[in-house]
Amino acid sequence: MSNNAAYLAPQVKTTSTSSKTTFHFAAGLCSGLTSSILLQPADLLKTRVQQSQQTAALLPTLKTILSSPHPIRSLWRGTLPSALRTGFGSALYFTTLNALRQPLAQSAVLTGSNGSANKGTKSSSALPKLSNWANLGTGAVARVAAGFVMMPVTVIKVRYESDYYAYRSLYGAGRDIVRTEGFRGLFSGFGATAARDAPYAGLYVLFYEQLKRHLAGLKHSGTADQPLAATSSSSINFISGGLAAGLATTITNPFDAVKTRLQLMPGKYGNMMRAVKLMIQEDGVRSLFGGLGLRITRKALSSALAWTVYEELILRAEIRWAEKAHAHV
């Protein structure tokens, strides 16, 4: 990250002209691909732990994978659908989020106190500053919209990663799902996914923006117009992303556990309420928190990586566009 980028950040104004949709899509795609490829083993382990009706332990599951003939390949099994889902899902999410936040940023009510959220405060970001309710709402809507579009890829990914079906290829997984369950099978677990993703994404954006503001205030006690250093900006975004993900993940993990069971065994579990009832009857309440440690680890790291990369790319682009606009004045 360049020092120029960090020191120009307070002067960059986020407008509908500079925040081009195509670049938000590209930045989201890049950040999503980076996090999904690096953290695929954690995602695979989470699926394996959650698929068990006896709530399998992490270490025995990992030991089984490592003892296979091709442990490295096994750990990254399902990387392609995961990268497609996370990469394009992130691209759609960040694009939709920006499209929602830009017009809301023009409203004094939704930015809070006549736009004071944007004035006289130190910032590690060039993104719009909104009220808590606006952050909660835009995060939830953007995530559910992106999740619906990417749902077929998500279902195929979960089935392919699981050893419950032992599919030999992604194409074979998709073909079998459509053949046995119809096209609606590609959307198995969407209700649980939406119930998990809407509050998760809303809470995440809310916590993330609050933590960034709080950490920026702790980091610098100088004048209000003092810009953040380059390392401070990236570290604040990374730490805020990780902490926000941990908090939101813990609150919404039961929905993730239910979603996994519905996607793996829709015939048995049927719907959300039936799945919750059966899981508690057969495995106890702890089954609703299966894979929590793995999910927190993966979500904290993936969210921190994705948002830090995304914020840096957007910040650099905003500055470049501002410089070009200034040069033509």
UniProtKB/Swiss-Prot annotation:
Subcellular location: Mitochondrion inner membrane
Membrane topology: Multi-pass membrane protein
BP GO annotations: glycine import into mitochondrion; heme biosynthetic process
Repeat positions for Solcar: 19-103, 130-214, 232-316
Keywords: Membrane, Mitochondrion, Mitochondrion inner membrane, Repeat, Transmembrane, Transmembrane helix, Transport
UniProt xrefs under InterPro entries: Hem25/SLC25A38, Mitochondrial_sb/sol_carrier, Mt_carrier_dom_sf
GO-annotated molecular function: glycine transmembrane transporter activity
Cellular component terms (Gene Ontology): mitochondrial inner membrane
Sequence intervals crossing the membrane: 25-50, 78-104, 136-161, 189-212, 236-262, 291-309
Keyword Transcription part of the UniProt annotation: no
Gene3D superfamilies linked: Mitochondrial carrier domain (1.50.40.10)
Catalytic reactions of this protein: glycine(in) = glycine(out)
Acetylation is among the record's keywords: no
Family recorded in the similarity comment: Belongs to the mitochondrial carrier (TC 2.A.29) family. SLC25A38 subfamily.
Function: Mitochondrial glycine transporter that imports glycine into the mitochondrial matrix. Plays an important role in providing glycine for the first enzymatic step in heme biosynthesis, the condensation of glycine with succinyl-CoA to produce 5-aminolevulinate (ALA) in the mitochondrial matrix.
Protein name per Swiss-Prot or TrEMBL: Mitochondrial glycine transporter
Source species of the chain: Aspergillus terreus (strain NIH 2624 / FGSC A1156)
